[in-house]
């Protein structure tokens, strides 16, 4: 449910990497399995969003697997942080007081703020690239 809740505010198409939402969901689920209640789960989600919320989708190429690993790691780190009473708080970057406020901020950034990023990524992907197959 956490990943779906996050994705609802972002919308169906965004330059925002959907793996970030999935990583938050994984962290929330694992926190629950470790006996976490609402507050612990909420802090895990906020921590994970603070860690990894700026990742962009570039078309699900080979780098996507690494982005998924990064998102899951952010979820796990968010959980470990809250287990040790360490958390991001309102004023730390895009984090606001309360998980729902933070989710709204991330959704606004992903939906509205990344609109031009989305257009630029598409331009980069369809433009012929010199030496695209090599580094």
Q: Where do the language-model regions lie?
A:
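Glycine/charged-rich beta-loop-alpha catalytic/anionic-binding loops adjacent to active sites
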Residues: 2-12, 56-60
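A beta-strand-loop signature enriched in Asp, Gly, Thr, and Trp
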Residues: 9-15, 40-44
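Active-site nucleophile and cofactor-binding loops and adjacent substrate-binding regions
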Residues: 11-22, 67
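Functionally critical mobile loop/hinge segments
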Residues: 23, 32-135
């Amino acid at each position: 449910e956490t990943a779906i809740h996050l994705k609802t505010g972002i919308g169906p198409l965004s330059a925002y990497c959907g793996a970030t939402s999935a990583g938050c969901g994984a962290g929330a689920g694992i926190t629950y399995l470790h006996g976490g209640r609402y507050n612990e789960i909420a802090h895990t989600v906020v921590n994970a969003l603070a860690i990894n919320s700026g990742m962009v989708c570039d078309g699900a190429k080979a780098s996507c697997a690494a982005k998924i690993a990064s998102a899951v790691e952010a979820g796990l780190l968010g959980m470990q942080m809250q287990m040790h009473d360490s958390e991001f708080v309102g004023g730390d970057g895009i984090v606001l007081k309360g998980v729902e406020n933070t989710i709204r901020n991330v959704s606004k950034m992903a939906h509205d703020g990344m609109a031009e990023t989305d257009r630029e990524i598409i331009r980069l992907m369809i433009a012929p690239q010199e030496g695209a197959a090599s580094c």
